Amino acid sequence: MNILLNGIAQELRDGAVVAELLMVAGLAEKRVAVEVNLDIVPRSRHATHVLCAGDRVEIVHAIGGG
């Protein structure tokens, strides 16, 4: 299936979950925020949130500061 990841087409297996996408993108151990179709997906749901063809996914890195 195809999704859009930060505006770029990305191919994943059917039934892939957010955690798999993060692994493919090399971000599995990073502090990131994930948004799917304008809804934030909490880290606690990364392993269970199933992606669908055509989903628009945005991933942003958490940056500390003050």
Language-model segments: residues:
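Ubiquitin-like/PB1-type beta-grasp interaction modules and other compact soluble beta-rich domains
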Residues: 1-65
